[in-house]
């Protein structure tokens, strides 16, 4: 990491940045509300964007095999998650992917569950799609968030939940869920036929010895009902590039997602 600059603080007040737009008249106001870091871009990424701009026309493109392979290699090397090219779908962002899944696997009025508090676009996206929002409240124990699994099961049964939008690692609480916790979630979803979306956009930022487990690595049976969402945007601080990917290992779920996107 020594070759990267984590010291220089760029002035972003005049760069039309969403994070700092409210600070133009108050430069001493600290903006800590969004996952957008004030580090200089990684030189290799910056140069790749410059090279592309100099060599290419900005028309419709297809996804090269090397891009799929980069995702395959990253997931295997960083998280022990083995996937195939045909299981990867690229999309503009995690939130648009959640919206696609809501439309593909639920009908208007169906119940969609989240663990609150959680990243606020989850609830907004569910409501904008005219679905019933079910909030399973996280409990604060031992200084961090925990899931009340009895209440989770009760919420799913009483509301006939069809879809569960899960955040792993958790935003904003920072919880890196254990494999045992993920196992319990998966067993409940399997028991009641709930499709789970696991937003793992912060998967590479597990710190202080904590290990992130991609949901589908915990139990092979989870691949039948879970959609994994991830992106390079948080890891490399490139949210403005609008890129993410979904990993769908159940072909039937994959086809339904594709139909909704078309």
Model-derived features with residue positions:
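Conserved core of the PLP fold type I
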Residues: 58-187, 204-205, 211-221, 227
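Walker B catalytic acidic pair
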Residues: 200
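A general structural signal for well-ordered alpha-helical segments in protein cores
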Residues: 42, 46, 67-69, 182, ...
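Residue-level marker for buried hydrophobic side chains located in beta-strands
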Residues: 168, 196-197
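N-terminal small-domain helix-loop-helix segment of the aminotransferase-like
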Residues: 2-93, 100
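Conserved core segment of the aminotransferase class I/II
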Residues: 47-48, 219-220, 224-261
């Amino acid at each position: 990491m020594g070759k990267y600059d984590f010291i220089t603080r760029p002035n972003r007040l005049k760069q039309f940045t969403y994070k700092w737009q409210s600070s133009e008249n108050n430069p001493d106001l600290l903006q800590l509300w969004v996952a957008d870091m004030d580090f200089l871009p990684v030189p290799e990424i910056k140069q790749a964007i410059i090279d592309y701009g100099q060599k290419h026309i900005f028309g419709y493109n297809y996804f090269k095999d090397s891009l799929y392979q980069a995702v395959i290699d990253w997931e295997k090397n960083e998280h022990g998650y083995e996937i195939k090219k045909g299981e990867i779908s690229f999309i503009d962002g995690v939130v648009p992917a959640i919206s696609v899944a809501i439309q593909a696997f639920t009908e208007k009025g169906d119940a969609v569950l989240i663990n609150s508090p959680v990243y606020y676009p989850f609830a907004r996206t569910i409501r904008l799609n005219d679905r019933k929002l079910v909030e399973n409240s996280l409990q604060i124990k031992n200084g961090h968030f925990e899931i009340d699994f009895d209440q989770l099961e009760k919420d799913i049964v009483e509301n006939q939940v069809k879809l569960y939008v899960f955040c792993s690692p958790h935003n904003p609480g920072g919880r890196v869920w254990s494999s045992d916790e993920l196992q319990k979630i998966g067993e409940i979803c399997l028991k009641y036929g709930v499709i789970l979306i696991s937003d793992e956009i912060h998967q590479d930022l597990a710190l202080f010895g904590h290990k992130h487990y991609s949901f589908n690595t915990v139990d092979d049976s989870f691949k039948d009902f879970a959609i994994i969402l991830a992106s390079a945007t948080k890891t490399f601080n490139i949210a403005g590039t609008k890129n993410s990917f979904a990993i769908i290992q159940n072909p039937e779920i994959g086809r339904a997602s594709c139909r909704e996107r078309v």
